[in-house]
């Protein structure tokens, strides 16, 4: 049947196969031929009927089966080779046979007689591709080994953290021991505090004492100079005015050897250091090195000599030179003296500045001891002088004499200051000693009065 079909086939004697889904081509010159759709072919198509038609259908079915196998192999080959997958057609060669083409242009298959396909030969490369993929997997396994090494390193780091934790655990008991020691020290301090309480005794003594100015309130302050207790600022100011106290500690005050402590030694050392520093500062000061107004000082001496007063001036740096405020008034042609008043019975001392020389001594003493015109605070301080019935006596020490020979001039309270200072030696400014006349029981004052009276008698 196959030989008959081949004979009744195409004029070339070759068999014609159509791919699956492809339509057969019409034979050249055939009148009665038809295509797969049933259209009549050109030529004598009416003669081809019967057995030849059945054989062609069987051959077509075999061709379809072969094409199905080829199609499967083409699909597998397209997955491996990307270049062939992009193409939408396949050629299959057949020895000594014509090419079968699809009219729609879907696929062109070429098949050889021995049914050896080119596609099968190209599929041999597929295992090589798989082996390459296996190699890639082996490389990945190498990376996994590296990750495992990193994990071991992290474990070593964790071991170092454990060491730190052990150090922290070791340091914790040390801190606890330190806290116990600090608590023990605090307990010791608490126990020692009752022993330090005797220092508070001086504060308690100060609190129990009364104010020496008002006498009603408890004392809160103590003057570092006169050591008097005070309770408030008004009392402090009042005691300074009554006692003429500066409130500054006397650094040169006498301290007995029994009462001499390390604080006194430190005070003396600091005092000497201050003196040395002041002297060095003065020696470096260019302003102080300039010549003083010596002409004015000579003028003061000459004017005092014309009035019969022997004025002596001390060098710069002495306290009396700094305190002296005596000036000469050119308009009134008179001296304005710096006068110091001392009241031994009340242990008081006052200073009068710019006192005109034509003013009497009674006028100078009136603001101090006058019962009516004196200041109430000063009158209270000088109560012994204000209430005295015998009056007062004004004395002035004789200058330019030996220290063991104390002499005093007795001044007339009804004369002016210039008349009382006439024919006398004055060092910087006059100092008047106001004493009570009825205090003859005091030997020191008695000696002073006797010497002053003798001096006054010899002068007459």
From Swiss-Prot:
Name recorded for this polypeptide: Box C/D snoRNA protein 1
Biased composition annotated in UniProt, kind: Low complexity: 19-28
Residues found modified as Phosphoserine: 39
GO biological process: box C/D snoRNP assembly; protein complex oligomerization; ribosome biogenesis; snoRNA localization
Any GO MF annotation of the entry: TFIID-class transcription factor complex binding
Residues annotated as binding Zn(2+) 1: 211, 214, 231, 235
Region (Disordered): 1-61
Pfam family, one: zf-HIT
Entry keywords, A to Z: Isopeptide bond, Metal-binding, Phosphoprotein, Ribosome biogenesis, Ubl conjugation, Zinc, Zinc-finger
Underlying gene: Znhit6
Keyword DNA repair: no
GO CC annotations on file: pre-snoRNP complex
Subunit (UniProt): Interacts with FBL, SNU13, NOP58, NUFIP1, RUVBL1, RUVBL2 and TAF9. Interacts (via HIT-type zinc finger) with the RUVBL1/RUVBL2 complex in the presence of ADP.
């Amino acid at each position: 049947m196959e030989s008959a079909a081949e004979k009744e086939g195409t004029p070339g004697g070759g068999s014609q196969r159509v791919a699956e889904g492809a339509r057969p081509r019409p034979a050249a010159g055939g009148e009665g031929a038809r295509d797969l759709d049933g259209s009549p072919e050109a030529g004598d198509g009416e003669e081809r009927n019967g057995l030849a038609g059945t054989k062609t259908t069987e051959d077509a079915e075999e061709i379809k089966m072969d094409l199905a196998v080829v199609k499967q192999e083409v699909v597998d080959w397209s997955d491996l080779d990307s270049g062939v997958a992009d193409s939408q057609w396949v050629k299959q060669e057949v020895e000594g046979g014509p090419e079968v083409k699809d009219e729609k242009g879907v696929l062109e298959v070429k098949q050889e007689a021995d049914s050896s396909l080119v596609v099968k030969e190209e599929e041999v490369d597929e295992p090589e591709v798989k082996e390459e993929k296996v190699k890639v997997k082996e490389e990945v396994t190498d990376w996994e080994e590296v990750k495992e090494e990193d994990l071991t390193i992290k474990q070593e780091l964790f071991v170092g953290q454990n060491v730190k934790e052990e150090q922290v655990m070791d340091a914790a008991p040390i801190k606890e021991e330190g806290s116990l020691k600090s608590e023990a020290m605090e307990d010791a301090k608490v126990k020692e505090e009752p022993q330090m309480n005797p220092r508070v005794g001086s504060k308690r003594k100060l609190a129990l004492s009364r104010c020496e100015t008002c006498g009603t309130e408890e004392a809160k302050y103590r003057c570092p100079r006169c050591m008097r207790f005070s309770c408030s600022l008004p009392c402090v100011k009042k005691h300074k005015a009554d006692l003429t106290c500066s409130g500054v500690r006397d650094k040169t005050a006498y301290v007995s050897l029994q009462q001499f402590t390390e604080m006194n030694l430190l005070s003396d050392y600091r005092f000497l250091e201050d003196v040395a520093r002041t002297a060095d500062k003065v020696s470096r000061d260019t302003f102080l090195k300039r010549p003083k107004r010596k002409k004015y000082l000579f003028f003061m001496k000459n004017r005092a000599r014309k009035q019969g007063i022997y004025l002596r001036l001390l060098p710069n740096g002495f306290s009396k030179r700094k305190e002296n405020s005596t000036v000469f008034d050119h308009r009134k042609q008179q001296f304005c003296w710096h006068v110091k008043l001392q009241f031994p019975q009340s242990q008081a001392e006052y200073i009068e500045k710019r006192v005109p020389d034509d003013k009497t001594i009674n006028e100078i003493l009136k603001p101090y001891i006058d019962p009516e015109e004196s200041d109430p605070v000063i009158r209270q301080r000088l109560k012994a002088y204000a209430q005295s019935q015998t009056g007062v006596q004004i004395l002035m020490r004789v200058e330019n004499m030996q220290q063991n020979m104390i002499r005093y001039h007795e001044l007339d309270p009804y004369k002016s200051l210039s008349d009382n200072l006439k024919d006398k030696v004055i060092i910087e400014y006059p100092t008047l000693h106001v004493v009570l006349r009825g205090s003859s029981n005091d030997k020191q004052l008695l000696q002073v009065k006797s010497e002053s009276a003798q001096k006054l008698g010899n002068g007459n």
